[in-house]
Regions:
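An exposed tryptophan-centered "aromatic clamp" motif
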Residues: 2, 154-171, 177-244, 253-256
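Short, compositionally biased
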Residues: 2-168, 244-256
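Short, conserved beta-strand segments within well-ordered enzyme catalytic domains
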Residues: 105, 173-174
């Protein structure tokens, strides 16, 4: 298993043009959010944090075209802010970030599974350098290529995405590094939304999130929250599966 650290600071490069959200905060804005979240036990619904605190956190979330990070996409095609009483039956997914001003929508349910069980030819471009891999937002293209591939090459992570809400006639895909890293960049807002609505899954530090991006034909990239709030990316050997199971998050093809 390999690792590539791209940044050593507590937040990612504030000038990044590929991911938005927490990483685009000024230091003053970041300090404000950090003060709000530093004492929260995200996995303990009975801790002292109040709903007002989570609402205050969400006020700092990035907004594009009247849609905010951590808003929910409803079955009727509208977006709504996190609020109590929101039913899972009415929700398609949650906004985890933006790319080219289009919202990246993630499923409420997370799955486990790795990209591959064996060595194979790559589905898309190979990224040997992590800094380049973080610029990849082609998960939709790669997933479509996989879907049209050979039946004997069925892999866990792709299948979880292709089969999610299959009866709804929606197109879900396995995210590339840029898309998955964008989601992890915004974990504070997503967790705050979860604590208000009780929908979805808490994003924890140390959890491994698989991507469809490959380092080469033998290794795939995954994302993990380490060192405070920023995600780093790592690679695992697909043949030996030393990593074990990764978390898979289906993302939705959605264009405004």
């Amino acid at each position: 298993m390999g690792v590539e650290y791209s940044y050593n600071s507590i937040i990612l490069d504030a000038n990044s043009k590929t991911t938005k959200g927490i990483i685009n905060m000024s230091q003053e804005e970041y300090n404000k959010v950090y003060e709000l979240i530093k004492d929260i036990n995200w996995n303990n619904a009975d801790d002292k944090a109040s709903e007002n605190l989570f609402e205050e956190i969400l006020e700092n979330a990035q907004e594009v075209n009247s849609i905010r990070i951590a808003d929910y996409l409803l079955e009727n095609g509208e977006f709504t802010k996190p609020h109590k009483g929101l039913s899972e039956d009415d929700v398609v997914g949650i906004v985890v970030g933006f790319h080219n001003e289009n919202p990246i929508i993630a499923s409420l349910k997370f799955f486990t599974g790795v990209f591959d069980r064996k060595y194979n030819s790559t589905f898309g471009d190979s990224y040997y350098i992590g800094k380049e891999a973080k610029k990849a937002f082609d998960g939709q293209i790669i997933t479509r290529k996989y879907k049209n591939g050979k039946r004997e090459d069925r892999f866990e992570a792709f299948e979880a995405c292709l089969n999610y809400r299959k009866n709804k006639n929606e197109e879900w895909y396995l995210g590339a590094v840029g898309e998955v890293a964008t989601m992890l960049n915004n974990w504070v807002y997503l967790n705050a939304a979860h604590r208000i609505t009780k929908l979805g899954t808490i994003i924890n530090h140390g959890d491994c999130y698989t991507t469809c991006s490959e380092r080469d034909s033998t290794c795939s990239w995954y994302c993990q929250l380490v060192r405070a709030i920023n995600p780093d990316i790592f690679w695992y050997d697909k043949g030996s599966r030393k990593l074990g199971d990764c978390i898979v998050v289906p993302l939705l093809v959605y264009n405004i």
